[in-house]
Swiss-Prot record:
<keyword id="KW-0472">Membrane</keyword>
<keyword id="KW-0408">Iron</keyword>
<dbReference type="Pfam" id="PF00067">
    <property type="entry name" value="p450"/>
</dbReference>
<dbReference type="GO" id="GO:0005789">
    <property type="term" value="C:endoplasmic reticulum membrane"/>
</dbReference>
<keyword id="KW-0756">Sterol biosynthesis</keyword>
<keyword id="KW-0812">Transmembrane</keyword>
<keyword id="KW-0503">Monooxygenase</keyword>
<dbReference type="GO" id="GO:0005506">
    <property type="term" value="F:iron ion binding"/>
</dbReference>
<keyword id="KW-0492">Microsome</keyword>
<dbReference type="GO" id="GO:0020037">
    <property type="term" value="F:heme binding"/>
</dbReference>
<keyword id="KW-0444">Lipid biosynthesis</keyword>
<dbReference type="InterPro" id="IPR001128">
    <property type="entry name" value="Cyt_P450"/>
</dbReference>
<comment type="similarity">
    <text>Belongs to the cytochrome P450 family.</text>
</comment>
<keyword id="KW-0443">Lipid metabolism</keyword>
<keyword id="KW-0752">Steroid biosynthesis</keyword>
<keyword id="KW-0560">Oxidoreductase</keyword>
<comment type="function">
    <text>Sterol 14alpha-demethylase that plays a critical role in the third module of ergosterol biosynthesis pathway, being ergosterol the major sterol component in fungal membranes that participates in a variety of functions. The third module or late pathway involves the ergosterol synthesis itself through consecutive reactions that mainly occur in the endoplasmic reticulum (ER) membrane. In filamentous fungi, during the initial step of this module, lanosterol (lanosta-8,24-dien-3beta-ol) can be metabolized to eburicol.</text>
</comment>
Length: 515
């Protein structure tokens, strides 16, 4: 008996049946959207394929997707992200609604916890009660004191200069450099040297900086929905996680060394590095921070801030290479305001370099590294001024980068123009403050410019981030001129494959040593 026709017929039958089910699901999905939709919920972005929904359009270019959807549905709408209903609320009102949502109504831990805990460690950030996280943020915030920031400037400059002298990327009088790799190394070395201390910095190698690329890919939108998916980039992220855990083992020895030094000194002197600060902190119930939690907080501090600093510094140099005259203005600003001999940078010098600050602000406006902020809805949330109620089955999505690119707030918004900040001042309303447990802060959501977020999860390292970027860029501009590669205009496109946006690779520029 010939089984081939029988098997072939069975395969064709299964194929026809599967295709039929697929087509029926599409038809039912379309009918549901057009006829049986819930008028009390935000409109759903039209899509043909169930489960997939608008995942592809969102993943390829979130901002293009947001602006196109807003043109059709308004500031508030829902789209399907890998089977999950994700409600977007754009504009300053949306930022207020989501980022300043009440703790009983919105939850960040359920969105980010599964991804961050294996990397950052247990009992910190999204692996602990929110009240404990707020205390941890307070410890970190007060570790970034004025005294500490002042002491960081020469350290950042030294690390940057050391990289220039030792890296093969800067050998000779001119050449090309892959900024993504170079800035990843520089920013992780400066962050480690300042925030973590010399002992921890000495244990970091360029390999650790390289692995941040793999970790970035682990923070992709699909992983927030399907963290268990056996995707290629997850294997690399696991490798990075293992390395990070090995590094965290160094922190207990560092804290032990600190304790021994303090006992030998028999005095009350204070170190300015973050480990020294955390060693002195206690929780509200009187419990000192365990060494394990200090280790995990230090890993978090190193990783969380490095993503943004690396990407933004890369974008800054790409912009300067595309407009070399702006880099020359930055160099001239230093000569004019600091002296022709360009003395070593000090903290007080930063206020004398307003154009440098504006270059950083403008780059943050257009190239914010995080395009999406998510919260899980815990209770039905009525949307003020509308008839909509967002149910607990939804995830909320805020995108402060949309307001930063909105022509209603910024003239010619897609043009990179640092000079726009000379006549524009972003002032936070001091009367609109709240204390989430780590000190009074401005809610901040009424501003269209929120590069560091807002609400209880607002980044507390804003001052350090600005300082780190200012010193790194000022140091590089002293030494080099930057240009685009031959035949290239503008800057590379943005890679949105991770939730941490960055330039499409390779991000290459030409450099020349200043004579």
């Amino acid at each position: 008996m010939d089984l081939v026709p029988l098997v072939t017929g069975q395969i064709l039958g299964i194929a026809y049946y599967t295709t039929g089910l697929f087509l029926v699901s599409i038809v039912l999905n379309v009918i549901k959207q057009l006829i049986f939709y819930n008028r009390k919920e935000p409109p759903v972005v039209f899509h043909w394929i169930p489960f997939i929904g608008s995942t592809i359009a969102y993943g390829m270019d979130p901002y293009q997707f947001f602006f196109a959807s807003r043109a059709k549905y308004g500031d508030i709408f829902t789209f399907i992200l890998l089977g999950k209903k994700t409600t977007v609320y754009l504009g300053v009102e949306g930022n207020e609604f989501i980022l300043n949502g009440k703790l009983k109504d919105v939850n960040a831990e359920e969105v980010y916890g599964k991804l961050t805990t294996p990397v950052f460690g247990s009992d910190v950030v999204y692996d602990c009660p929110n009240s404990k996280l707020m205390e941890q943020k307070k410890f970190i915030k007060y570790g970034l004191s004025q005294e500490a920031l002042e002491s960081y400037v020469p350290l950042i400059a030294d690390e940057t200069n050391a990289y220039i002298k030792s890296s093969p990327n800067f050998k000779g009088q001119s050449g090309t450099i892959d900024l993504a790799a170079a800035m990843a190394e520089i920013t992780i070395f400066t962050a480690a040297r300042t925030l973590q201390g010399e002992e921890v910095r000495s244990k970091l190698t360029s390999e650790f900086a390289d692995l941040f690329h793999d970790l970035d890919l682990g923070f992709s939108p699909i992983n927030f929905m399907l963290p268990w998916a056996p995707l290629p980039h997850n294997a690399s992220a696991i490798k990075h996680t293992t390395y990070a855990r090995d590094l965290s083992g160094n922190y207990p020895s560092a804290t032990g060394s600190w304790r021994r030094r303090q006992r030998r000194r028999q005095d009350k002197s204070k170190g300015t590095d973050m480990i020294s600060n955390l060693m002195r902190c206690v929780y509200r119930d009187g419990t000192p921070i365990p060494d394990k939690e200090i280790a995990h907080m230090m890993i978090t501090l190193l990783m969380a801030g490095q993503h943004s600093s690396s990407a933004i510094s890369c974008w800054i140099l790409l912009r300067l290479a595309s407009q070399p005259e702006m880099a020359e203005k930055l160099h001239a600003e230093q000569i004019k305001n600091l002296g022709a001999d360009l003395p070593p940078l000090q903290y007080k010098d930063m206020d004398k370099l307003p154009l440098l600050r504006n270059v950083i602000k403008e780059t943050l406006r257009l190239h914010s590294s995080i395009h999406t902020l998510m919260r899980k809805v815990k209770n039905p949330m009525p949307v003020p001024g509308t008839d909509f109620v967002v149910p607990p089955s939804h995830t909320l999505l805020s995108s402060p980068g949309v307001t930063a690119r909105d022509e209603r707030h910024f003239r010619d918004p897609l043009r990179w123009d640092p000079h726009r900040w000379e006549s524009r001042v972003e002032v936070e309303d001091s009367s609109d403050t709240v204390d989430y447990g780590y000190g009074a802060v401005s809610k901040g959501t009424r501003s269209p410019y929120l590069p560091f977020g807002a609400g209880r999860h607002r980044c507390i390292g804003e001052k350090f981030a600005y300082l780190n970027l200012e010193v790194i860029v000022a140091t590089l501009v002293r030494e080099f001129r930057f240009f685009n590669p031959e035949g290239m205009e503008g800057v590379p496109d943005t890679d949105y494959s991770s939730l941490f946006s960055r330039p499409v690779q390779p991000a290459t520029v030409r450099w020349e040593v200043r004579s």
